[in-house]
Amino acid sequence: MVRIVYEEGLEAIAKRIAQASSGDIVKLENAMEAPGVLEEVDSIGLVYCKCGKDISDRMVRFIKEGLGSIELKGLEYLFSICVCEGSAKPQYALKVVNRLCSQIGCLPSYSKAVSSDDKTLEEICRDVSKESIRLADGSPFIGLYMKANKKRFKEA
């Protein structure tokens, strides 16, 4: 099951991605109050805003304290969607999420930016709904990294 954690104001985007992947959504604040809602899922998606060139303090706290406090052994994959408007460059925000996730023992297998452009969102929905994303599409060495560094991931 896919569960998508989204920041306030991004519910419509999170719902579209969840529908494409037959998953459901949880507001960031609710996931912070009860991080256990993420323990029984095999896939977690993070949908967050780019704030300046960084991500919000709420999302930083959620990754460190929320995701970091639960058992991720059942997690098959984690994906990260950065929402930015206009021609903003999201690379730094995506790197921040990757770094924070690696500190708690996991890495997103898929990271992408989306704007209000439907074409980009449709591409993300298509990618997330594919089974091939579970193989860390675009980042083929994530599994090796996690094993070599004894990171938390689903046991084979």
Positions of the model-derived regions?
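FMN-binding flavodoxin-like domain, especially the glycine-rich phosphate-binding loop
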Residues: 2-12, 16-29, 33-156
